[in-house]
């Protein structure tokens, strides 16, 4: 497989609820973060590919890992990330953890309970936050708050895309026991709108995601880099709005995402709030970290 061939899908263009190298991030960090992002998107393309067999997907993911570790030069995404990490003297541990999650996407299509979902988040979401913190030289003491924030964002994404994931990928992140407790079934995820039972299930999970996001609020005060602190504040503002929408709307019936105007308004509001906190010692988003 050459650098110009191999699996490609529309995953590069899909909205995800985790940090990318926005204009807020200092320019000196953007190249590495973007290299990481492109590597992750390539792995996502593979795991979500519509026509590749599971064994083929795993082989491609193994190739990405091998080349990230220096064994080959055919995948530009792996080579560029490896080079960028080497330049900064950073190990590939977080990218390797994410590859574990993509392998889970290939081999595990159902989750029995909340604990299994959180275990998936340990590989699919938490490494993203840890990577960004490491790039900025932040202490590992910030990881617990980052972990719950990233897990909350991941659960929100699962709820936003639950119908599409089921119909397009036969992949269900909604735990079986939550469906059962509400009297809903997996097959209902293919419907044009949610039953009352499905809405009860999805909203109960949105409430759990909200608890995680509240725990992640502690990250704002823990981060030392002021640009990254603004970035976290903006992400939290977006997440608060999304989770409130998930508690009121039906993701099977309508697209539960922020509009460009909402993104702008919430971003400006979050930055203004953080600026006020820095100037006057006030803030509204300081919560205790929760265990996951």
UniProtKB/Swiss-Prot annotation:
Gene3D superfamilies: Farnesyl Diphosphate Synthase (1.10.600.10). The keyword Metal-binding does not apply. It holds the Pfam family SQS_PSY. Its EC number is 4.2.3.156. InterPro entries: HSQ_synthase_HpnC, Isoprenoid_synthase_dom_sf, Squ/phyt_synthse, Trans_IPPS_bact-type, Trans_IPPS_HH. It catalyses: presqualene diphosphate + H2O = hydroxysqualene + diphosphate. It is an enzyme of class 4 (lyase). Pathway: Secondary metabolite biosynthesis; hopanoid biosynthesis. GO terms for molecular function: geranylgeranyl diphosphate synthase activity; lyase activity; squalene synthase [NAD(P)H] activity. Keywords: Lyase, Plasmid. The keyword DNA-binding does not apply. SUPFAM superfamilies: Terpenoid synthases. GO terms for biological process: terpenoid biosynthetic process. Involved in the biosynthesis of the hopanoid precursor squalene (SQ) from farnesyl diphosphate (FPP). Catalyzes the second step, the conversion of presqualene diphosphate (PSPP) to hydroxysqualene (HSQ). Belongs to the phytoene/squalene synthase family. HpnC subfamily. This is Hydroxysqualene synthase.
